[in-house]
Amino acid sequence: MQLIEANTVFSKIDFQEDIDYNIYPKSIYECPICKNKLSFNMQDFKKYSLNKNSSFPIEEQERIKKMLEFSKREEPNSFIDYYCPKCNTSTRIYFTVWAGGRYTSGSHLEFVVIDDDT
């Protein structure tokens, strides 16, 4: 299990609604295990805004929770769970959604937890 800062695996970590479009620009994520690249955009993060439902089995969720406790990191308000399509590594992207008044909102990618034991 690894906790990785988002800026080391994503090409873009900040999205703002009044500047970025829903599907462009994209942020490219590179899996640290197999180097597979996936693209994410603001719409992906809006879809999972304030998400607290995991698609991982309970055991996987518990391991991630323990990793956060061990790292002493505060849990951001949103996450996306998925399995790398190439190497099948369990991956959770943690991000913070924010509102900036009446006209804008956005997302800041914080860190990624991968289970390289799967």
What are these regions (language model features)?
Residues 38-41, 90-94:
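Short, non-ligating residues that shape and space the ligands of small metal-coordination modules
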Residues 29-34, 84-87:
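Short cysteine-rich clusters marking metal-coordination/redox-active sites
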Residues 53-58, 79-89:
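Cysteine-rich micro-motifs
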Residues 1-15, 46-67:
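Short, charged low-complexity linear segments at domain edges
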Residues 30, 39-45, 56:
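Structured alpha/beta or helical-core interaction and ligand-binding surfaces enriched in interleaved
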Residues 42-50, 95-102:
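Short cysteine/histidine-rich zinc-coordinating motifs and their immediately flanking basic loops
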Residues 16-28, 72-78:
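Short, flexible, mixed-charge glycine/proline-rich loop motifs
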Residues 51-75, 104-118:
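Short microdomains enriched in Cys/His and/or Lys/Arg
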